[in-house]
Amino acid sequence: MYAVFQSGGKQHRVSEGQTVRLEKLDIATGETVEFAEVLMIANGEEVKIGVPFVDGGVIKAEVVAHGRGEKVKIVKFRRRKHYRKQQGHRQWFTDVKITGISA
């Protein structure tokens, strides 16, 4: 059984027991969260596709950890003009473990 849900402007395909890295959620570590924006649920041959969301579809997950991703360097450079700017960015994320999928 697997499902596709939407969180943080992105779509994720998950199954029970899987750990997924999402955009930062303001929920403490160890708490549970429910995602109601379920786009599709597949259980063997039975497939439910939402328009746009599946009615009664809920994905339950437990927040495992929060953190920051790898550093991305942004460089602006103009040749022969003695001009160079550097900037770095580290995006916050939340790791969640999928505990249940229901339709």
Curated annotation (Swiss-Prot):
The keyword Endoplasmic reticulum does not apply. InterPro entries: bL21-like (IPR028909), bL21-like_sf (IPR036164), Ribosomal_bL21 (IPR001787), Ribosomal_bL21_CS (IPR018258). Keywords: Ribonucleoprotein, Ribosomal protein, RNA-binding, rRNA-binding. One of its GO terms (molecular function) is rRNA binding. One of its GO terms (biological process) is cytoplasmic translation. GO terms for cellular component: cytoplasm; cytosol; cytosolic large ribosomal subunit. It comes from the Bacteria. Belongs to the bacterial ribosomal protein bL21 family. This protein binds to 23S rRNA in the presence of protein L20. Part of the 50S ribosomal subunit. Contacts protein L20. This is Large ribosomal subunit protein bL21. The lineage of its organism: Bacteria, Pseudomonadati, Pseudomonadota, Gammaproteobacteria, Enterobacterales. The gene is rplU.
